[in-house]
Every structure is written in structure tokens, then in C-alpha cells.
């Protein structure tokens, strides 16, 4: 439900690519048979996307995974706070990872789609106060993420437990223009990390 130009999963956003995925769907029973065989080897399942909270059967699916004896990690962009509340109430999730695209004032520039800033703010609060382990994370893109932007993100996330800065990769993107962009150097990312450590308890880098 977002259209970030640098999205690394364009197959879940572009309509033509989505059609191809639909023809390759794995039946649910096949998925759960696979999990059954992996008991004792796998600890959990990550439900990602795209945006999993827009799927009507997410709660039911996550509960089935839990009932099968596995932990559930949910990746989200925070646009469906009510879904997050239901997942927590039903004990259908064990870990959250929420994408923080940019500072609140710059979201529209990045996501290129209709969204509610209030929903994103609410989701952040729900996750942070859920009592469950979580991480917030931002993919850093040159020209989009600067020291000023990270200062604003830091003010918003102040007191958060865990935050990761993920380096942009140009191998696969939604918009062609981003295929020409390069990621930040490790030195530049470390500078962002040091800045963010003023605001969050734990900050890491993913190259």
C-alpha cells in the first residue's frame, strides 16, 4: 500500500508482477506441512510483504502458525494500527519490525501513496508499548536521508528500545531511477548511528 521508489520488493507493488505471484501461490496446507517437517529446526516464521496487515486473514494465519508451535515475527509499515492491536490482544505475534520510512513531515515525499500520519504515529506507540520485543528500522537512501532527517526521526522515536539503519541497495527497486543510486559508505552510516544513539537505547547498522 506504499510506493517507495527504492522498494526492494517491487514484485509486491507493481500490478503486472503481482499477477505473476498470484499464479505461483503455495497452498496453505503445503506451507504447514513444510513447517511440521521443520519442527525442532525452525523457531519461527516472519510474515512480511508488501504490507501483511492489509490481508484480511492475517490474524487467522498467524494464530495457525502459533498453534503449530512456532514464533511469529510481523513486518509492518504501520498503516493499520487496529490490526496490530488485534494481533497483540490475540497473542498472535511475538516480535514486531516496523519500517520508519523517514521523519513524519517527509513521509509523503517517500511513500508516494495515500496514508495517514496519525495511523503511523499510533502504530509506533502501540508497538513501543506492547511489552513485546520490537525493532524500528529505516532504509537510508542518499538524497532522502540526511543528518537533519535522522535528527527528526530520533526526536520521534526517543526512548525506543531498538533501531536499525539499513543501507540502500540498488539491485532491485520499484523505480528505475534508483538503480543508478549507490548506498552510503560504512563511515557515513556510523555517523548516523552515533547521532541516533542520543535518542534510542540500541542502534545498529545493516549494510
Summary of predicted features, one role per range:
Residues 50:
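Short, charge-patterned binding micro-sites
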Amino acid at each position: 500500500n506504499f510506493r517507495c521508489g527504492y522498494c526492494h520488493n517491487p514484485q509486491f507493488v507493481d500490478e503486472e508482477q503481482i499477477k505473476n505471484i498470484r499464479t505461483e501461490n503455495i497452498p496453505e496446507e503445503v506451507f504447514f506441512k513444510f513447517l511440521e517437517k521443520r519442527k525442532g529446526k525452525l523457531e519461527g516464521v516472519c510474515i512480511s510483504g508488501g504490507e501483511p496487515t492489509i490481508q484480511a486473514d492475517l490474524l487467522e494465519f498467524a494464530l495457525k502458525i502459533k498453534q503449530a508451535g512456532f514464533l511469529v515475527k510481523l513486518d509492518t509499515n504501520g498503516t493499520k494500527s487496529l490490526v496490530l492491536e488485534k494481533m497483540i490482544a490475540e497473542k498472535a505475534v511475538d516480535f514486531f519490525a516496523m519500517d520508519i520510512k523517514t521523519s513524519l513531515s517527509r513521509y509523503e515525499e517517500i511513500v508516494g501513496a495515500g496514508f495517514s500520519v496519525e495511523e503511523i504515529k499510533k502504530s509506533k506507540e502501540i508497538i513501543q508499548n506492547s511489552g513485546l520485543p520490537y525493532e524500528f528500522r529505516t532504509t537510508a537512501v542518499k538524497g532522502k536521508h540526511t543528518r537533519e532527517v535522522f535528527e527528526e526521526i530520533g526526536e520521534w522515536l526517543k526512548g525506543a528500545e531498538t533501531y536499525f539503519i539499513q543501507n540502500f541497495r540498488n539491485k532491485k527497486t520499484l523505480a528505475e531511477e534508483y538503480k543508478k543510486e549507490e548506498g552510503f559508505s560504512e563511515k557515513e552510516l556510523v555517523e548516523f548511528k552515533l547521532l541516533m544513539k542520543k535518542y534510542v537505547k540500541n542502534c545498529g547498522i545493516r549494510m
